């Protein structure tokens, strides 16, 4: 990952400060269970944007990734998606005036050999390392949100929330939970599923 300029870091700090002020001004906000209007707006943008990116991600069987944040005019926006491989994606650095508030990526097409319906431990670790929340869409059309402060990932919406891979086959014996912590995902990754 490339080093960010001091100006970019200042813009990130400014966005974080504005977000903290918004959270303080919104009484009753507590963790993942309650959402502020800014977060709701971000969730809506995330689902709409991932819905647009998902079809190409499935067709190309590649992860796509990028960022959500404030553009130079202060508008909440998404960066253009970067194409990755079938198992990873490294986002291009956004313009210097873009203030990152969250990351996003897709999991590509369905595969019976890959647990792509939940974020991976690497997905969570990357968001924790960047100190930025992360959105993920899955082949079934689920959307997940990793909340860095709470160190948890929650399923924002279930199958079909964004355009799904039509070849997706659910595995009832390995159905995703509604939320995971990093250790929960480690257990899931090491679990052997006999059959679907």
Model regions and ranges:
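Active-site-proximal loop/helix of nucleotide/amide-processing enzymes and allied scaffolds
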Residues: 33-39, 89-102, 106-196
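Bacterial N-terminal signal peptides that target proteins for export
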Residues: 3-17
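Bacterial N-terminal signal peptides
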Residues: 14-27
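Catalytic phosphate/metal-binding cores of nucleic-acid and nucleotide-processing enzymes, i.e., regions
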Residues: 85
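N-terminal secretory signal peptides
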Residues: 33-79
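Bacterial Sec-dependent signal peptides at the C-terminal "C-region" and cleavage site
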Residues: 24-36
């Amino acid at each position: 990952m490339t080093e960010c300029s001091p100006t970019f870091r200042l813009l990130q700090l400014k966005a974080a400060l504005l977000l903290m002020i918004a959270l303080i001004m919104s009484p009753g906000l507590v963790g993942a269970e309650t959402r502020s209007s800014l977060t709701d707006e971000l969730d809506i943008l995330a689902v709409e944007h991932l819905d647009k990116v998902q079809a190409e991600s499935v067709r190309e069987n590649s992860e796509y990734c990028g960022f959500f944040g404030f553009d130079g005019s202060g508008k909440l926006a998404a960066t253009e998606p970067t194409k990755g491989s079938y198992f990873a994606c490294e986002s291009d650095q956004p313009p210097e005036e873009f203030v990152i508030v969250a990351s996003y990526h897709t999991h590509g097409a369905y595969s019976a050999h890959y647990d792509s319906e939940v974020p991976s431990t690497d997905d969570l670790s990357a968001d924790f390392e960047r100190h930025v929340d992360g959105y993920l869409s899955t082949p079934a059309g689920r959307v997940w949100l990793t909340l860095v402060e709470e160190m948890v990932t929650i399923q924002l919406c279930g199958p079909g929330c964004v355009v799904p891979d039509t070849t997706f086959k659910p595995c009832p014996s390995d159905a995703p939970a509604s939320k995971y912590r990093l250790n929960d995902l480690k257990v899931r990754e090491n679990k052997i599923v006999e059959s679907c």
